[in-house]
């Protein structure tokens, strides 16, 4: 447990900030809930009183979260008002489409029964985006970390569409020439950190895309991550060079579902998928077999130096999650775009919807209240006054608008709030897919670091481990499943990738120590993986006749040639999703790291929603979220099983752990006889009886690489870059 609450006081210099001192209040003094109101002495780095015996006055009080009447209660009823104290309220009468990957082929998903008596029916993200852009009549607004004009959205030869072979760039130019207002905001990465670029972490085509649309009717603005007004020169430099615009949204006007040809409505897309190269994939996640079809002109492999279609696979498959929002919630996404365009878009080119009010209907429900498929949805963000127009100026007004105040900065941190709120309400299980998993550094072991210097303070990992602890103490089952990539995209041996893996190890170790301590206190000697278990995704394919034959070969003795000969590679997990009890889901652009959860670092957007007729109140929820989770599990495991209906049960977690242990052995073995039967692999670490995260025997390095699975602390990269 953290032993002190630490108050840090710095001198606000124009360049940097000098530490004046820190004040400490022992946690023991506040846990009984008594209010503390007193002066506390300031100490230096070595815990000695600073000169002139300075003090600060603090007033604080602790409230035990388990005393909250909503703790562990789930959504409970359709009257659940949403996450409190946020910028956007929860909207009712919405419609949501959930997407696994950019595309799902016909007949991929087996029959998954839902409460309605129907079966789960998957949606197809890029086909729907193509239709939405093609059919827009007034405006198309897009924001992305990256937008690439040369990709095509429709690539399934069994599901052709009229005009489907057009590139995204040509499609947007065509729509703009028809009089549709096309506005694109993409992150300007010209200033981004060279340290990361050389490790293969950034390649966004921002300048190519800007040049492509020059002298066309499409308005494309490169958007730097500008700081708010409050920072020092160094802080401002950090924000503009180290942080990104990460929201991935499309907002269009759309036809009415009832066929009214005169009226239009708003439809929005929110999630993890950028409209750029390397993102199109299906749940098959092939490494070699699509290199002369869907991926011939879209070969993405940034983890090997010099990888190319000419040298052949494996390409890096891409697993991601996205959503389409209809009804009042779609307008909140539109308002977010307008706030950002007014702040950084330059010219005032936004369509004035007031002038179109006889055409575009005002925000109104997309579903009737008694429709069992209706959704309640809330929009969350990580963004600050440097990136969004019209934020209040004072801390008091900010608090009223559900915003928090930083150092002379107003911040929307509601994505983190939404995760924390959902974890605290959870009753039975949590299923997470995320590109990163690190944080709660205040609770990391202080062996070879000073946790207070790391500043990856977001609460999500600690909230998860404390939720499990509370359930162990109550004698109730609770399981957390987390899927992450093998390593963050980039050269796996590089300093930045190894540093992130090191933070991830410290995060997992902190969580496993919490779980093991709770089990021991109950006299249980159980495997902590029965409560908290981590996975990655990978594929391995035998060579088939008629496969694409590359004209060149990778360098000898490279990771690339080794992976090509072993016929294996990770499937990159880029999803940012959490499912709680099959009744509540969060989907967005935000990773589980400080950059995404901070609010004043990367800009992000996410939706959180549930179906009021499909709650886990008396029996398990069996609505769209349940169907979506089982669709994902089928994609990852290559099978479905009755135990999967109760993910919290020991039978389910034991079965999933056994299957994924076997799949990891097949993935990492020297020989290959058949395709891998599923993609979900045990994350290749062990957990000691004390909770230390260790190497799996024989797995110091990821297969085909010299990259350590447990990572390595970086001596030259500041934590602000890699957390």
Go through the PLM ranges and name each one.
Residues 168, 419, 432, 460-468:
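Extended, hydrophobic alpha-helical segments in both membrane/secreted and soluble proteins
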Residues 56, 60-72:
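Non-catalytic propeptide/linker segments at domain boundaries
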Residues 535-543, 554, 558-561, 565-566, ...:
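Pan-eukaryotic secretory-pathway lumenal catalytic ectodomains of glycan-active enzymes
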Residues 407, 451-456, 564-567, 594-595, ...:
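Short, contiguous acidic/charged loop-to-helix segments that flank catalytic cores in large enzymes
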């Amino acid at each position: 447990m953290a032993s002190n609450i630490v108050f840090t006081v710095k001198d606000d210099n124009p360049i940097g900030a000098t530490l004046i001192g820190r004040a400490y209040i022992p946690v023991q003094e506040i846990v009984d809930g008594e209010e503390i109101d007193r002066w506390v002495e300031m100490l230096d780095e070595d815990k000695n009183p600073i000169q002139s015996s300075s003090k600060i006055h603090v007033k604080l009080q602790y409230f035990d979260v388990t005393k909250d009447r909503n703790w562990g209660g789930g959504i409970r009823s359709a009257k659940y008002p949403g996450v409190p104290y946020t910028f956007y309220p929860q909207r009712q009468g919405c419609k949501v489409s959930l997407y696994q990957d950019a595309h799902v082929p016909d007949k991929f998903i087996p029959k998954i029964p839902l409460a309605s008596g129907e079966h789960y029916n998957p949606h197809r993200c890029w086909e729907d985006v193509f239709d939405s852009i093609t059919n827009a009549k007034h405006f198309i607004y897009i924001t992305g970390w990256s937008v690439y004009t040369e990709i095509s959205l429709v690539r399934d030869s069994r599901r052709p569409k009229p005009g489907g072979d057009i590139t995204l760039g040509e499609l947007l130019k065509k729509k703009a020439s028809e009089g549709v207002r096309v506005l694109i905001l993409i992150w300007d990465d010209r200033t981004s950190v060279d340290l990361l670029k050389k490790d293969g972490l950034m390649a966004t085509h921002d300048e190519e895309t800007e040049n492509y649309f020059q002298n066309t009717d499409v308005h494309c603005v490169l958007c730097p991550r500008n700081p708010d007004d409050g920072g020092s020169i160094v802080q401002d430099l950090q924000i503009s060079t180290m942080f990104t615009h990460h929201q991935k949204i499309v907002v269009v006007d759309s036809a009415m579902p009832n066929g009214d040809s005169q009226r239009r409505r708003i439809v929005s897309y929110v999630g993890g998928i950028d409209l750029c190269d390397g993102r199109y994939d299906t749940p098959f996640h092939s490494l070699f077999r699509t290199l002369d079809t869907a991926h011939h002109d879209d070969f993405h492999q940034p983890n090997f130096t010099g990888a190319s279609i000419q040298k052949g696979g494996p390409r890096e498959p891409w697993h991601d999650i996205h959503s389409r929002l209809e009804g009042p919630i779609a307008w909140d996404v539109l308002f977010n775009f307008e706030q950002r365009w007014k702040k950084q878009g330059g010219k005032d080119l936004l369509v004035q919807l007031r002038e179109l009010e006889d055409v575009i209907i005002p925000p109104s429900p997309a579903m009737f209240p008694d429709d069992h498929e209706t959704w309640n949805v809330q929009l969350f963000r990580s963004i600050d006054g440097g990136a969004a127009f019209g934020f209040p100026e004072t801390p008091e007004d900010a608090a009223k608008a559900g915003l928090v105040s930083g150092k002379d900065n107003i911040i929307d941190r509601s994505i983190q709030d939404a995760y924390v709120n959902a974890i605290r309400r959870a009753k039975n299980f949590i299923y997470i897919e995320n590109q990163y998993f690190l944080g709660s550094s205040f609770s990391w072991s202080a062996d070879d670091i000073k946790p207070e210097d790391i500043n990856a303070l977001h609460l999500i990992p600690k909230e998860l481990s404390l939720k499990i602890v509370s359930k162990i103490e109550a004698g109730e089952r609770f399981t957390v499943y987390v899927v992450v990539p093998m390593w963050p995209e980039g050269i796996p041996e590089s300093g930045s990738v190894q540093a992130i893996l090191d933070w991830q190890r410290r995060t997992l170790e902190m969580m496993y120590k919490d779980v093991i301590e709770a089990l021991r206190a109950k006299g249980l000697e159980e495997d902590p993986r029965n409560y908290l278990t981590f996975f990655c995704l990978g594929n391995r394919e035998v060579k088939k006749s008629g496969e694409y034959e590359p004209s060149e070969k990778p360098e000898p003795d490279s990771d690339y040639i080794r992976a090509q000969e072993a016929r294996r590679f990770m499937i990159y997990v880029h999803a940012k999703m959490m499912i709680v009890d099959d009744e509540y889901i969060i989907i967005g652009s935000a990773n589980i790291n400080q950059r995404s959860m901070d609010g004043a670092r990367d800009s992000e957007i996410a939706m959180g929603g549930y179906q009021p007729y499909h709650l886990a109140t008396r029996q398990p929820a069996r609505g769209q979220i349940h169907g979506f989770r089982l669709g994902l599990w089928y994609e990852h495991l290559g099978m479905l099983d009755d135990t999967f209906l109760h993910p919290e049960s020991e039978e389910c977690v034991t079965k999933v752990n056994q299957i994924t242990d076997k799949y990891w052995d097949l993935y990492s073995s020297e020989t290959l006889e058949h395709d891998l039967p599923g993609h979900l692999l045990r994350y290749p670490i062990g957990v000691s009886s004390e909770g230390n995260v260790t190497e799996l025997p024989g797995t110091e390095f990821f297969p085909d690489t010299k990259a350590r699975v447990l990572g390595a602390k970086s001596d030259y990269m500041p934590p602000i870059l890699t957390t």
